[in-house]
């Protein structure tokens, strides 16, 4: 069975870097790990002439084709995350927004101060985590729509979609289904000014977790507590 993890990750990263949609034609895409739809918080010093001068400050937008008989499916392979651990949620698709580390400044050839930013590794040593605080209130604009997530058997530690975001973002026309045991279907509906539309979750220990902030998943500190204010959900089926 073809493993699409690396190809999807490359496409998501490319789309974010160049402000493009990552488009999924109809089909089944099998993955053997988490698709990391990660972004970095924009900071004022990185704007020039009304444009972002750092490509990494755009956000991922994942959209599935609506032209086929069924939606495209991201399918987690059997036995990818077999061990259940309530303190370590392993998602099929994971949206995160990080505060860039502040110790990467340098002076360019024109004498101007610039910044080098980096994304954190998948797992961080405890001494490194504070440099990559997760910032949900400034997680603005990502989308995940028209794509189903299927979690195959022997994945008791697997969760579906993590989407803790702020305004102008959204999830729509998505079904998350567990074919065996599993953990959380959907965590973190976006806050006010966004929407979660036509979402179906089948199976799992927890269908919907509205914890949008103060989530230590993966060991990253997160600003704020509880959920983003005034989330809008319609067409929700659990």
Cite the ranges covered by each PLM segment.
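Extracellular/periplasmic carbohydrate-active domains that bind, remodel
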Residues: 1-238
């Amino acid at each position: 069975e073809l493993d699409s993890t690396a190809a999807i990750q490359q496409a998501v990263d490319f789309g974010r870097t160049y402000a493009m949609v990552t488009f999924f034609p109809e089909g089944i895409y099998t993955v053997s790990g988490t698709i990391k739809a990660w972004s970095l918080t924009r900071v004022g010093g990185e704007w020039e002439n009304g444009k972002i001068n750092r490509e990494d400050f755009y956000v991922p937008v994942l959209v599935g084709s609506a032209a086929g008989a069924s939606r495209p499916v991201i399918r987690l392979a059997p036995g990818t995350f077999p061990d259940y651990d309530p303190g370590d949620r392993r998602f099929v698709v994971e949206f995160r927004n990080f505060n860039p580390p502040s110790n990467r400044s340098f002076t360019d050839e024109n004498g101007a101060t610039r910044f080098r930013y980096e994304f954190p590794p998948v797992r961080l040593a405890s001494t490194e985590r504070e440099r990559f605080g997760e910032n949900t209130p400034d997680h603005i604009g990502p989308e995940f729509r028209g794509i189903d997530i299927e979690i195959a058997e022997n994945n008791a530690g697997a969760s579906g979609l993590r989407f803790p975001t702020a305004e102008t973002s959204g999830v729509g026309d998505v079904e998350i289904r567990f074919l065996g045991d599993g953990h959380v279907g959907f965590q973190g509906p976006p806050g006010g000014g966004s929407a979660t539309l036509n979402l179906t979750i089948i199976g799992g220990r927890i269908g919907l977790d509205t914890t949008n902030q103060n989530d230590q998943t993966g060991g990253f500190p997160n600003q704020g507590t509880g959920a983003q204010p005034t989330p809008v959900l319609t067409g929700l089926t659990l």
